[in-house]
Design a protein with these regions (language model features):
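P-loop/Walker-type NTP enzyme "switch/lid" segment
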Residues: 7, 35-119
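N-terminal cationic-hydrophobic initiation segments that often serve targeting/anchoring roles
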Residues: 23-27, 83-84, 118-121, 172
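Structural motif
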Residues: 7-11, 34-37, 96-98, 130-133, ...
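Cytoplasmic membrane-interface segments at the C-terminal ends of transmembrane helices
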Residues: 25, 67-68, 173-177
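Hydrophobic/aromatic beta-strand patches that form the interior of the parallel beta-sheet core
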Residues: 4, 31-33, 92-94, 149-153, ...
Length: 204
């Protein structure tokens, strides 16, 4: 498995927490990419408690790629280590955007970045992408088409499931655009609906 893409239809709790928890417990070396177009630097300010100076992150990579830099080397050099309990694995973070609007500047850089992620996967390093909420702008097609797994993160409350229902066409479009597996990641199942009930309702 190489690229694991996580997104949310909106109103779902814990997308970034889910991505971080997955990275910290992942069985292989892994890079967590913050690709949320509405930046919050939650991991840097929360999990890392602001101990590491800000990095240019994704927008810095876009600039470097346009200047002809090697995608894999540049991506790796831009990551920072994430503390974790298992000393025999590498867990690293690629910081996201510095402010609103920067996501629109990535353009063709996503193709180079997705290729770099595939190359890392072949070298034994998986990539987990926190893509933020589904919104007016579609997720980068280069990521969607090359993802091994796309997880749609949702809660099990009625309001959260309503958000999932409203984004059904976008989820279906992603399913058609990838050869990877697309599935639901339910945060807090059984509150009140369990995973089976949610899956049954979402596939109608």
């Amino acid at each position: 498995m190489s690229i694991i893409l996580l997104t949310s239809p909106g109103g779902a709790p814990g997308l970034t927490t889910t991505a971080l928890g997955l990275a910290l417990t992942w069985p292989r070396d892994v890079v967590l990419v913050d690709a949320d177009p509405c930046p919050g630097h939650v991991i840097e300010s929360g999990y890392l408690t602001g101990r590491i100076p800000p990095r240019p992150g994704l927008i810095g990579l876009a600039t470097a790629f346009r200047d002809g830099a090697d995608p894999v080397q540049t991506m790796w050099e831009e990551t920072i280590p994430l503390p974790h309990d298992s000393g025999d694995r590498m867990v690293r973070l690629l910081s996201g955007y510095g402010h609103l609007g920067q996501a629109s500047l990535m353009g063709a850089a996503w193709s180079s970045l997705a290729s770099a992620m595939i190359d890392l996967g072949q070298a034994g390093v998986d990539v987990i992408v926190d893509a933020g909420r589904l919104g007016p702008e579609a997720l980068p097609s280069s990521l969607v088409s090359r993802a091994s797994l796309i997880g749609i993160v949702t809660g099990s409350r009625l309001r959260q499931l309503a958000g999932l229902s409203m984004r059904a066409e976008e989820v279906e479009a992603m399913s058609s655009a990838t050869t990877g597996t697309v599935g639901l990641v339910v945060v807090g199942p059984g509150r009140p609906y369990n995973s089976r009930e949610i899956d049954r309702k979402s596939t109608r």
